[in-house]
Structure formats: structure tokens, C-alpha cells
């Protein structure tokens, strides 16, 4: 798209508005060298978006939705800089039709998410949470034995890890898991032939000690783990989800954990974020064999620094006409 480098297209400095700065966790996006006006808001309600972006050429967003009606009300907008890999909050077709560029950041959190997955593998198999609690609540100091049998402990080496999804993060998890002595397999799509290098969907469910989800949320994958597919899993198996919350029917997972069929879960994402009071994800968090983290797998210092720098580069390059 043609635009004047560093200007609003009328010779004036570009107006850049960050609508949800709080999603950067205090990390600063580098500002461009080109003349500009920079405005920041920690959080923006849907009803505030149009007013705050009035006259802006650049919008910086993470979770703020930008639909066609919103874009129609912003004739000056030229760039939406998304501080994430996914751009599902933007109606990309509507943006393209209006000549608005959408630039995101791909691959910044691959190491961070993969390490979070491996952390969950260790924490669940080694009983990290219940063992810590046995010290804090006085069971160790008040007992007669030299140790506390607070939870079952399983060696990770020799377990099968089933991965659903085969992108960069899944491959990074696979490499780390193999280094720990795990048998790593990739699942094919549900109801389809497995394909080269993969096992059938149902076979991975039935034979894996741990499964980890690394696929996008689509109509096909929504609630891919439900009462029926959970019943196919190996008794006592563990489930990890650092991808999208709605990949799992959490009510069905809760029932499977309650029955003992599923041995544990590590979950970093929820269908609605932040979760609503009393929601299934918060009920699960109270269980001793479940670890819930608040969508934190991506936010290592190195990952967020890279995200901030590359978002700044996206803006600077756009203003420079690149």
C-alpha cells in the first residue's frame, strides 16, 4: 500500500495508538525514529476503540477485536500491528478490502511454550504441587517417616508423548521430550488416514501416557477432546493444553478426572480469558492432579523482548514504506 514514510499521508506525524498495553507485561515496544505521536492505553473496552483510534494511522493490539464495522469508522487507519502470532481478532478480509495492512509476529514464543510443556510433564509426573504442599502444611515436619508419600511419582523416561499438531512448537516439544527418553508420536487428523510420520488419531489417544495439544482452534478441532475421545484414552493418562482453551470440553475433562480415568492435566488456556467466576477451568484448578497456569506459557523474558522488538520493527518498516 502506498503511504508516506513516517507520516499520516498529509505531512503530519503518524498517530500511533496502543490499545491494550497491559498485555505486554511492562515490556516496551521500541518507538520508530520517524516523526510520530504515540498514545498508550492499558486496556480498552469495545465501546472505546473507535474514539481512541480516531485520526490514528497505526493501531497496536493484542486482544482488541477489529471487525468490519469498527474499521469502517476509522478512515485514517493504515496499519494494525498485532502483538501476537494469531490475527483472529482482526477481520482480515475487511482490513484488506479497506487497504489496511495487518502485521503480526510469528515464532517468538516457540521455546518458551515448549519449555512450559516440559515443565508440566515434570510437575505432573513428579507430583510437584502435592509434595510442596506436604511441606507447607506441616505433614513432613509433623510426621514420623523421613519422607511423605504425597502423590504417585512416575519416571518420564519410557513414557509415550502423543502430540496433536506438528508445527514449530510441537516439533520443539518433541525434541526436548526425546532428549528425556520419551517415545514421541504425532497424531493424524481425526477420522482421516494417519499420513506419513503420524499415527491414527484414535491410536495416539489409546497408547499415549501424556498427550499435548498444539493445533489451532477450528470448527474441526473445537472440543476435539470430549467425553467420547477422552474415553478412548489410556487409563491414567495426562493431558496438556497450551494451545487454545476450546480444544477441550472442560466439563467432560472434569468428569474424567473425577472418575480417575484421566490421571492429571496441565492447562494454560481457557475458552474465555480471563475466566468467569465458577467456570470449569477454575474448578479444575482446585484439583491436586491439575495444574492451571494463566495463559503464561508464552511470556518468558526472551519471548516478550523479541515480541516487543519485532512489533516495533513492523511499525518502523511500515512507516518507512517497506
Describe the function of each predicted region:
Residues 98, 106-160:
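Phosphate-binding beta-alpha-beta segment of Rossmann-like dinucleotide-binding domains, i.e.
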Amino acid at each position: 500500500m502506498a503511504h508516506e514514510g513516517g507520516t499520516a499521508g498529509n505531512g503530519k506525524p503518524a498517530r500511533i495508538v496502543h490499545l491494550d498495553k497491559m498485555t505486554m507485561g511492562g515490556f516496551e515496544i521500541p518507538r520508530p525514529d520517524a516523526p510520530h505521536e504515540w498514545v498508550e492505553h492499558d486496556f480498552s473496552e469495545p465501546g472505546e476503540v473507535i474514539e481512541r483510534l480516531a485520526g490514528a494511522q497505526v493501531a497496536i493490539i493484542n486482544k482488541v477485536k477489529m471487525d468490519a464495522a469498527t474499521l469502517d469508522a476509522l478512515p485514517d487507519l493504515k496499519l494494525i500491528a498485532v502483538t501476537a502470532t494469531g490475527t483472529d481478532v482482526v477481520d482480515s478480509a475487511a482490513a484488506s478490502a479497506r487497504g489496511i495492512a495487518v502485521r503480526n509476529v510469528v515464532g517468538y514464543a516457540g521455546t518458551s511454550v515448549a519449555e512450559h510443556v516440559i515443565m508440566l510433564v515434570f510437575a505432573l509426573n513428579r507430583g510437584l504441587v502435592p509434595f510442596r504442599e506436604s511441606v507447607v502444611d506441616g505433614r513432613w515436619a509433623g510426621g514420623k517417616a523421613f519422607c511423605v508419600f504425597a502423590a504417585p511419582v512416575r519416571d518420564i523416561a519410557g513414557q509415550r508423548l502423543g502430540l496433536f499438531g506438528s508445527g514449530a512448537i510441537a516439533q520443539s516439544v518433541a525434541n526436548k521430550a526425546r532428549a528425556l527418553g520419551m517415545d514421541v508420536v504425532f497424531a493424524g487428523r481425526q477420522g482421516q488416514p494417519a499420513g506419513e510420520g503420524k499415527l491414527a488419531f484414535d491410536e495416539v489417544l489409546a497408547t499415549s501416557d501424556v498427550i499435548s495439544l498444539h493445533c489451532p482452534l477450528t470448527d474441526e478441532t473445537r472440543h476435539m477432546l470430549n467425553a467420547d475421545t477422552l474415553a478412548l484414552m489410556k487409563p491414567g493418562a495426562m493431558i496438556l493444553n497450551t494451545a487454545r482453551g476450546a480444544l477441550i470440553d472442560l466439563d467432560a475433562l472434569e468428569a474424567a478426572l473425577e472418575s480417575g480415568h484421566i490421571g492429571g492435566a496441565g492447562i494454560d488456556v481457557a475458552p474465555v480469558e480471563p475466566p468467569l467466576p465458577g467456570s470449569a477451568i477454575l474448578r479444575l484448578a482446585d484439583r491436586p492432579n491439575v495444574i492451571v497456569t494463566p495463559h503464561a506459557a508464552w511470556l518468558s523474558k526472551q519471548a516478550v523482548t523479541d515480541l516487543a522488538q519485532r512489533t516495533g520493527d513492523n511499525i518502523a518498516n511500515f512507516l518507512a514504506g517497506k
